[in-house]
Amino acid sequence: MRLRKKWWARPELEASPIFKSLDEARELKGNWKDEFKNNNDIYLELGCGRGGFAVQAASKFNDKNLISIDLKDEVLVYALKNIVDAELENVRLVAMNIGMIAEIFDENEISRIYINFCNPWPKDRHNKRRLTHTRFLTEYKKFIKPGTEIHFKTDDLDLFNDSLVYFEESGFELLYKTYDLHNSDYADENLMTEYETKFKEKGIKSKFLIAKLK
């Protein structure tokens, strides 16, 4: 569903120190720890939507920093509100196309990546747009630390199975996988996204994996 343009969203985002434009994020490349004013590990969420997962993750891992990315101001403005309401200081939001992600991070700057329910791009000619495709994994390897884990969730079976191949081809070790996350031994650790809650209510199984950079 196409989002209705909210002309007030960008000014509201820019008024908050939590939000960074693409230009500001580029200037922070290699210096994100200065932005957070600590040396804690930095986790990255690719596609944060309205921020439900970000709030949970930043609260649970309050000794880590989290950078959450999304393209649309119209969703980021709601993520900002949720983060502010939760009084979290260890989160930053960036508005950008994830295809440019290597422009804002330096080598060894990220310690974990979350990819939750991204666009499955089912047509063969669009597969390279998948956030787990080898093309993207190659970009992530430019700025993640050795041993970094990528946590990936999807409701799409074809995307999940293809992603298993992408990770293997890109030099990642598969640590965990399940085709039914909510009935798995990882269920208690799982942090639910907005989409995931809706899928669960409809009986749609979530697939989940953890892959580690060797």
Swiss-Prot record:
Positions of the UniProt region annotated as Interaction with RNA: 125-130
Entry's EC annotation: 2.1.1.33
Broad enzyme group: transferase
Pathway annotation from the record: tRNA modification; N(7)-methylguanine-tRNA biosynthesis
One of the record's GO molecular function terms: tRNA (guanine(46)-N7)-methyltransferase activity
Catalytic activity, reaction form: guanosine(46) in tRNA + S-adenosyl-L-methionine = N(7)-methylguanosine(46) in tRNA + S-adenosyl-L-homocysteine
A single Gene Ontology CC term: tRNA methyltransferase complex
Keywords of the record: Methyltransferase, S-adenosyl-L-methionine, Transferase, tRNA processing
Binding-site residues, substrate: 123, 155, 193-196
Positions of S-adenosyl-L-methionine binding: 45, 70, 97, 119
Family named by the database record: Belongs to the class I-like SAM-binding methyltransferase superfamily. TrmB family.
PANTHER family for the chain: 3-DEOXY-D-MANNO-OCTULOSONIC-ACID TRANSFERASE/TRNA GUANINE-N 7 - -METHYLTRANSFERASE, PENTACOTRIPEPTIDE-REPEAT REGION OF PRORP DOMAIN-CONTAINING PROTEIN
HAMAP family: tRNA_methyltr_TrmB
Function field: Catalyzes the formation of N(7)-methylguanine at position 46 (m7G46) in tRNA.
Name of this protein: tRNA (guanine-N(7)-)-methyltransferase
Lineage of producing organism: Bacteria, Bacillati, Bacillota, Clostridia, Eubacteriales
